[in-house]
Swiss-Prot record:
Upper classification of the organism: Eukaryota, Fungi, Dikarya, Ascomycota, Pezizomycotina
Protein name (database record): NADH-ubiquinone oxidoreductase 40 kDa subunit, mitochondrial
Molecular function GO labels: protein-containing complex binding
UniProt cross-references to PANTHER family, sorted A to Z: NADH DEHYDROGENASE [UBIQUINONE] 1 ALPHA SUBCOMPLEX SUBUNIT 9, MITOCHONDRIAL, NADH-UBIQUINONE OXIDOREDUCTASE 39 KDA SUBUNIT-RELATED
Superkingdom of origin organism: Eukaryota
Entries under Pfam families matching the protein: NmrA (PF05368)
């Protein structure tokens, strides 16, 4: 097998010229995975054949669509375990016919999890919760759910397992979200030592709970004066990093902290949001001792997400970056700054008063005077 593999890797690039004189470059290669499975590598493309078979748990969430899209357009077969029929429909068109496979599963059903991973050579676990519900607690999702997925990965000897955790993951944290995320990391590493751990900072994008939350009229009550500090990261950058980890086996057994280039407080981001939407959102600061129990009651009494006691606790924890963890720099990625994307993601929140604002620049004033006679 070794001489054959070496011969395939050394195959020269084939250049084909058509009748019009244009050159079409065809590159083919064979990669042998850790378990000896041959993977046909090519230039990629939506309709290309070969490539990896990847299972993406949590693909229907904010981060999931970005990694599914990147894998599918490279010719990979993507298996998407889902719970809700309506939440997964938009993912079907991210890949060519037959490249995106949907499998219904239950996080408490080991058989459905094993069915989702048994044909794959890479598994992504993006499952997580920002708040507990009556059906799933933080421990159910971040620890027990991750444990079942890791056991299925180990049972079928999957080549790569990439587990997405969270920034500030600490088993001794007073915040249950951070504590369960850290214990989940320990569990998956004990079952599958070659697990790649990814800890993204608070992410911003089209479906985020950062920019859109600050732009919403419902986000009124805070407890720490919005003074918590963190490095917000673009969700597209995180998706690109997850894709590159698949192609680079040196990322196995490593821990990555993925965060943006600048540190902001929530108050600073809120000011950027207000400037972008031409509105002033009101925020009322309530002491932690009062707001935390109220948030806990609302989380249990209402069936739609408003706030939870753990989210209030999270406001008092600044982001702490692990100096020993690898970052975007080790993947050759330059993370984007949130200040460059506020208009892109928040333009739909703009007030109609925007159209009545006076010209802002001298050029706009000249154009305004030029066409004023048409009004």
């Amino acid at each position: 097998m070794a001489p054959l593999t070496a011969a395939m890797r050394s195959t020269p690039r084939i250049i084909v010229s058509n009748a019009f004189g244009f050159q079409r470059r065809a590159i083919s290669d064979v990669t042998i995975t850790r378990t000896g499975k041959p993977i046909i590598r090519n230039q990629g493309g939506r309709s290309s054949l070969g490539g990896h078979t990847a299972t993406v748990f949590g693909a229907t969430g904010q981060l999931g669509r970005y990694i599914v899209n990147r894998l599918a357009r490279q010719g990979c077969t993507v298996v998407i375990p889902f719970r809700d029929e309506y939440n997964k429909r938009h993912l079907k068109v991210t890949g060519d016919l037959g490249k995106v496979v949907m499998i219904e599963f239950d996080l408490r059903n080991t058989q459905s999890i094993e069915e989702s991973v048994r044909h794959s050579d890479v598994v992504y676990n993006l499952i997580g919760r920002d708040y507990p519900t009556k059906n799933f607690s933080f421990e159910d999702v971040h620890i027990e759910g991750a444990e079942r997925i890791a056991e299925a990965v180990a049972k079928y000897d999957v080549d790569r397992f990439i587990h997405v955790s969270s920034y500030n993951a600490d088993p001794n944290s007073e915040c249950e979200f951070f504590a369960t995320k850290a214990r989940g990391e320990q569990v998956v590493r004990s079952i599958f030592p070659e697990t790649t751990i990814v800890r993204p900072a608070p992410m911003f994008g089209f479906e985020d709970r950062l920019l859109h939350k600050l732009a919403s009229v419902k986000n009124i009550l805070t407890s720490n004066g919005m003074q918590e500090k963190y490095n917000p990261v673009h969700v597209i950058d995180v998706g690109q990093a997850l894709e590159q980890m698949l192609w680079d086996d040196n990322t196995a057994s490593e821990t990555f902290e993925l965060y943006g280039p600048k540190t902001y407080t929530t108050a600073e981001i809120s000011e950027m949001v207000d400037r972008e939407i031409y509105k002033r959102r009101r925020h009322v600061n309530v002491p932690k001792k009062i707001l935390k129990p109220i948030a806990g009651v609302l989380n249990k009494a209402l069936w739609w997400p408003i706030m939870s006691a753990d989210e209030i606790e999270r406001e008092f924890h600044d982001q702490v970056i692990d100096p020993e963890a690898k970052t975007f720099k080790d993947l050759g990625i330059e993370p984007a700054d949130i200040a460059n994307f506020t208009y892109h993601y928040l333009q739909s929140y703009r007030s109609n008063a925007y159209y009545d604002l006076p010209p802002a620049t001298e050029k706009e004033r000249r154009e305004d005077r030029e066409y004023i006679h048409m009004l």
